[in-house]
Swiss-Prot record:
InterPro entries: Aldolase_TIM, DapA, DapA-like, Schiff_base-form_aldolases_AS. One of its GO terms (molecular function) is 4-hydroxy-tetrahydrodipicolinate synthase activity. It comes from Lactococcus lactis subsp. lactis (strain IL1403) (Streptococcus lactis). The gene is dapA. Its EC number is 4.3.3.7. Keywords: Amino-acid biosynthesis, Cytoplasm, Diaminopimelate biosynthesis, Lyase, Lysine biosynthesis, Schiff base. NCBIfam families: dapA. Pathway: Amino-acid biosynthesis; L-lysine biosynthesis via DAP pathway; (S)-tetrahydrodipicolinate from L-aspartate: step 3/4. This is 4-hydroxy-tetrahydrodipicolinate synthase. The lineage of its organism: Bacteria, Bacillati, Bacillota, Bacilli, Lactobacillales. GO terms for cellular component: cytosol. Belongs to the DapA family. HAMAP family: DapA. CDD domains: DHDPS (cd00950). SMART domains: DHDPS.
Length: 297
């Protein structure tokens, strides 16, 4: 699929869920938990899926496990919504080889590539890293700027430079409204700007961005859908009221390191997503109680 075709497909994907990875008690992937979870997400307005991203605990997944997840989810989704695969690491060579492998699958619509973590590259190093990934195959690439987890930030000037590459089509921006507003204003109109911060979904859409790549949409997809619909109709005050209503729930989902809270909630709702792989740990009994009280029914 060409960059242009993927952009067209993503035009209808405003609410993209960063999918959790279900685990069994022995720590192996629980593939049997995917069908119900995914079907319910689609029924509640998930319009795209991120596979093997941060919420999926990608640092503790092997590439073989990631490929198995891609295949399993693709079989369930069957072309109904776009699939975006996490393809980036802090090793450029490894990322290049993996994006080539993912591109050959034929059913992944785009790759999500995170800023290199731990290495602390310069802006030129960041640019060259993403350029190597974007030019390694014909798989369109979405930049992932999340300095809160990786320390290093892709500066807005570097993002504008990367946007000139034909195969770089979008960004998951996890910084602030100032950067979001600047990027939405300065980037090409067909370049898709998503926030990766659930609490900024309203701001991003109201500023003219594409939407949200979300953790909270596992349980708040309907609310995001209604909020975006109000914005599209020019009813900013009604949209803002929805934002204010869901914000305490969003905050609860990030009260301890994600994805522990969302897994707590999903398990409570019967989705059998299990625990987390070390070094991440599940919420404590007290943390779970507080989170579930704030989420409600």
């Amino acid at each position: 699929m060409s960059a242009k075709e993927t952009i067209e497909k993503l035009q209808n994907a405003r609410i993209i869920t960063a999918l959790v990875t279900p685990f069994k008690e022995n720590g192996q992937i629980n593939f049997g938990a995917f069908p119900k979870l995914i079907e319910d997400l689609l029924a509640n307005h998930t319009e795209g899926l991120i596979l093997a991203g941060t919420t999926a605990e990608s640092p503790t997944l092997t590439h073989d496990e990631e490929l198995a997840i891609f295949a399993a989810v693709n079989k369930i989704v069957d072309g109904r919504i776009p699939l975006i695969a996490g393809v980036g690491t802090n090793d450029t060579r490894d990322s290049v080889e993996f994006v080539k492998e993912v591109a050959e699958l034929g059913y992944i619509d785009a790759g999500l590539a995170v800023t290199p973590y731990y290495n602390k590259p310069s802006q030129e190093g960041i640019y060259q890293h993403f350029k190597a990934i974007a030019t390694a195959s014909d798989l369109p690439i979405i930049l992932y700027n999340i300095p809160g987890r990786v320390v290093t930030e892709i500066q807005v000037e570097t993002i504008l430079r990367l946007a000139e590459l034909e195969n770089v089509i979008a960004i998951k921006e996890c910084t602030n409204t100032d950067n979001l507003a600047y990027l939405i204003e300065k980037l090409p109109k067909d370049f898709l700007v998503y926030t990766g911060e659930d609490g900024l979904a309203f701001h991003t859409k109201a500023l003219g961005g594409q939407g949200v790549i979300s953790v909270a949409s596992h349980i708040l997809g309907q609310e995001f859908f209604e909020m975006f619909a109000e914005i599209d109709q020019g009813s900013i005050q009604k949209a803002a009221a929805i934002q204010r209503k869901i914000l305490p729930k969003i905050n609860a989902l990030f009260s301890v390191t994600s994805p522990a809270p969302i897994k707590t909630v999903l398990n409570a709702k019967g989705y059998e997503v299990g625990g987390l792989r070390l070094p991440l740990v599940a919420c404590t009994t007290e943390e779970s109680k507080i989170i579930l009280e704030k989420i409600g029914n």
